[in-house]
Amino acid sequence: AITATIQKEQNLIIRHEDVPALLVAGIAGSGKTSVLLQRIAYLFYRNRGSLDPRHVFLISPNPVFAKYIENVLPDLGERNPETITYHDLCARLLPAGRNPQDKESPLELLWKIDRAVEGLRFELADLRDIKFYGVRLVSAGAIMQLMQKYPNVPAGPHLVTLVREELFNRLDARLKQMAATEAVQDELLCLSLDEQVRLFNAPYDPQTEQEARDCALTYLQERFSGAVLAIERDEWLRIDRIGMRLLGVENLPVSAWLYLNMAVTGLGNPDARYVMIDEVQDYTPDQLAVMARFFRRAHFMLLGDPHQA
């Protein structure tokens, strides 16, 4: 009878209706992990044809957990969702060299960010040059001029998206301009034969001026590929400086930095539909707030042991 009761309760969770947040509490060994995996399999089955594994994320406490469950869903006839740790998620989103391990951010600071960005106006000092290998490709002043093309668009994700697209065009024009210079042509002549073949699939031997420019552009696009990534990641925005100006806080904690970046740029995964967080009691409130904002359109399933909180 006890076993039947447990199975009945587990089935209720597995087949529970879609809700923004589903909290499952239980002590160690109570079957939470089994319920979690069966819930994922059930969601895939119920939404077959519309739900893809890339729409489902499992936030695990450590990489060992991912290894432990990697064969369970395939045995049930389903593919595995992406399984990551919170540390890995932060490492993907933070600038290079920034340690994901940091002091906790008070929730009040995150709510203050929500209020502060409503009145945000970008300043020149909030921007940085897009610069690689000592070459300034787009200046902070040029970025500010792009922003000023949209006087009726408030500072925030929409304006950042518009400027980001303008920056891609500006970078493309700058590289084409550089490709026509004699200095870049000289650089191509100094490439080793192996490098020429790798870049152009043949030794560098242009027959026309246009061919020479095309080869130069290919070379520059690879050389400055980091600039494309910097634009994509909105690294031309000085989030720390914006935070200091809006909040009066220097050296923002990781959670506050991420939250501010998401509020200003729209950073996030809007395609995620379900996010499962195991051992939820191990996360701080600010970490949960960051995940809720990053996966802003997703429904959450939270599993934890209140006795370990």
Regions found by a protein language model. Name each.
Residues 295-309:
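Conserved RecA-like helicase ATPase core segment
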Residues 41, 281-284, 307-308:
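Catalytic acidic motif of RecA-like/P-loop NTPases
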Residues 32-33:
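Conserved lysine of the Walker
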Residues 276-277, 304:
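Hydrophobic residues in beta-strands of the RecA-like P-loop NTPase core, especially within AAA+ ATPase
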